[in-house]
Amino acid sequence: MYKGIFVTATDTEVGKTYVSCKIAETLEKSGINTGVFKPVSTGNRNDAKALIKAAKIDENTETVTPVFFKNPMSPYGASLLERRASDKIFDLKKINNAFKYFLNKYEFTVVEGVGGILVPLKQNFFVSDLIKKFNLPVIVVARFGLGTLNHTLLTVEKLKRDRQKILGVILSGKKNNNDVSVKSNALIIKKITNLSVLELGYNEKIDLEKNIWIIK
């Protein structure tokens, strides 16, 4: 089993926090001491609260999310709007120390990114750079419906170019029965990428035995 995973996504609001919580909840129920870590957040720290609740751990939101911007946008954009130097606010040393804290304290840590992999965290530093720095295997969260093929394949291609280990893709959210692409998207992604693909609708549980690739 790995020491942790990095959960990224094809876009914002595609179910990244939901999937991260489901993974943390499943691992905790399996008896695995699981930490959760969202290095940076904007708008609020509600994702950190949800992650803490899912993992059932005694941590505060400031520890789980050490870097925070009040405006709900990219961290770099928020730093410009708030007229704060992104290099000072987006403190990589602070993030690295927090990351090491979770890896040392917990058997397994679920790390959740922010937005997609090319969201700028500061000038010339993206989520993809943070993934490389942490060097954890990656799970890509994507939408079920129309348009997800392009977004998912672009994300996977970028990760492969960065030589990052990709564990698989999780399609999340509510299926639109009027969208015929929903019936074939998972299969097409699997055939093109040769990755494991899990379809996870809302309120569905993760069968860890059938989807052991999530942690191994």
Curated annotation (Swiss-Prot):
Protein name: ATP-dependent dethiobiotin synthetase BioD
Swiss-Prot/TrEMBL keywords: ATP-binding, Biotin biosynthesis, Cytoplasm, Ligase, Magnesium, Metal-binding, Nucleotide-binding
Family stated for the protein in its record: Belongs to the dethiobiotin synthetase family.
Positions annotated to bind Mg(2+): 17, 47, 112
Organism: Endomicrobium trichonymphae
Annotated positions binding substrate: 42
Phylogenetic lineage: Bacteria, Pseudomonadati, Elusimicrobiota, Endomicrobiia, Endomicrobiales
Coiled coil: none
Cofactor: Mg(2+)
Pathway: Cofactor biosynthesis; biotin biosynthesis; biotin from 7,8-diaminononanoate: step 1/2
